[in-house]
């Protein structure tokens, strides 16, 4: 069901010489599809997203539409254009249920650069409509609940490792899950000092964890 996008991440990890099985890879698509199937079965979706994201939801049995949707779902859309924005804003203003995939503001690229991620697109739409989506990805409670249920692990047996305070580390905030911030990405020690979100551990990079 989610194999195509899931495989994209698995392939990326393999290039980094990290072997992982498909059942070990969980992405926000999994969380969103499971939740929407459980609570909004049969609803029509307008997806602001890439063809790959739309394919994932079509394969999962959802009805996608360009007109009169019940739900607007905002993804990390590298094919975003004005027509998509216009439609999304119109449907959201008209009262559609509104969800977002992930709250990340920026997506890191090779060479240390960043491009706008789903969270930035959500803020753009909020500026026009006054509405902000409920997200499925970190730090959403849906993500942590999904991980616990799918792995069968207890919260105290889980460690969340990431480079973003407001998503990766925040998802573990207020729980028994251990949070580990790596400084090899978006957040810095200065960000930690200024933030109310505090990781349990701070490391320079992943190599410090596996020593």
Model-flagged regions — what are they?
Residues 1:
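Active-site loops and adjacent core secondary-structure elements that bind or stabilize anionic groups
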Residues 4-26, 33-211:
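Asp-based, Mg2+/Mn2+-dependent phosphohydrolase catalytic module
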